[in-house]
Amino acid sequence: MTGVQTCALPISGLYEIRIGTNILYTDAKGDFILQGELIDTRARRNLTEERVEKLTAIKFDELPLKNALMQVRGKGERKLAIFEDPNCHYCHKLEKEIATLDNVAIYTFLIPILGENSVEKAKNIWCAKDRLTTWSQWMVHEKEPAAATCDTAAITANLELARANNITGTPTLVFTDGTRIPGAAPLRRIEELLTASAKK
C-alpha cells in the first residue's frame, strides 16, 4: 500500500486506498474494501479512471530526452515520447501507423523488456552509426540490425525510468500534457491527443 487518500471523494465515509496505480475504496475503519470503478452518474464521469490518469501522468519536460532516439518531422512543433521494445509486435504496428505523422518530434525510449533478444537488438540499434535509419529499417521493413557495440547506459536508464513510472508494456505513448496511452493507438487518436496536448 503506497498511501491512503482521505479527500476529494464525493461520498461521505468513503476513502481511497492506493496500491501502486491501482485504486480501491474503504470505509473509515477499514472493515470493508470495494474494488471497482467510482462513477459520477450525474456528471457522467468515471472518477476512478480520472484519478488513475492523474496518478500515472508523466512530466514530459522531465523526461531524459538524451536517452531517446529523436526524429523530427516537418517543424517538429508537436512532441511525442514512445517507450518501445524492438521485438514488440504492437510497436512494429505502431511505427507503420505513425509513418505519416507530420510536424512532430518523436522521442523513442528503447526499453527491451521482452527477453534477451530484445536486449541485443536494442543495443545494436542504439550503437548503430545511424540509429534512426537502423530503427526504422527494423521496425518497418524487418531488416535485422547489424551487431554493434558502444556505451548502452542509456538503455539501462530507460528501463529504470519505465519501472519508476510503472510502464510495464509496450508501446506506451506519452504526450506533453502528461497523458499516457498504453498500446498501439490508431493514428486518428494520436493526432487528436497531439493537437490537444499542444494547446495546454
Write out the residue ranges for each language-model feature:
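A detector for short metal-coordination/catalytic motifs
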Residues: 154
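C-terminal low-complexity, charged extensions that often adopt amphipathic alpha-helices
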Residues: 49-62, 171
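Structural alpha/beta surface segment adjacent to cysteine/selenocysteine redox centers
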Residues: 76-151, 161-168, 196, 200
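Short, small-residue-biased leader/transition segments that mark boundaries at the very start
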Residues: 2-9
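Non-catalytic, surface beta->alpha helical segment in thiol-disulfide oxidoreductase systems
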Residues: 21-50, 163-164, 169-170, 174-200
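A short beta-strand-turn-helix
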Residues: 59-78, 100
